[in-house]
Amino acid sequence: IEDLVAYRMQHDSLILKRQDTEIETKFGKYRLRAYQQTTNNQVHIALTKGEWKDNESVLTRINSSQMSNDILGILTGFSNNSLDKIFSLVNKEKKGAVLFINQEQHSENLISRIVELKKLQKKGNISKIPPLKMDLKDYGIGAQILHDIRIKKLKIISNNKQSRRVGITGYGLEIVEYINY
C-alpha cells in the first residue's frame, strides 16, 4: 500500500492551490492557503506561522471541519476553545501548521453522526457532538497539502490516543511526536 501511495503522491495531485495570502486573525498573523480538491471541488485550508527547514519537525494539527461552521468567523472573532488552545501552542512555538480538511456532510456521514448522537444522548451526554471522521481520501488530501507547505516530520497536536497511521510513510510523512492540548 505504501508504495502505491508514494507513486500517487508523485504523479496524481488531487489539489489545486487557489489562494495564498497573509491574513490577520485573532491569533495573530498567519499565512492562509486555500486548496481546491479536483475530485469534488471542496476547499481545504492550511494556516501556517513561521518558517521551517525541509527536515525539521513541525507542530501540526489536521482538523476535520465543515466550512459551513465558518472557519473564517472563528479565525476573526467567534470563540472556539479547542482552536484557541491549538493556536496558542503554535504561537508559543512561533511556527506550525493548522489544516482544515473540508468535510461537508454527505448523506451517509450525516446519518451515521445522527445515530452516534442518539447513542451519546442515551448515555446522558446531551451536549456532546459526535466527531467528524476522516476517511483515507482525507488523509491523502492532507498529505498533499503538507507536501506543498514542505512539512515531512510532524509533531501532531491531538488529544486522541496515539495510533499507527497505515500508509503514512508512503505519503513521505513521519510522526515524530504527539502533543496534547
Q: How does the language model describe each region?
A:
Residues 1-181:
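Catalytic domains of riboflavin
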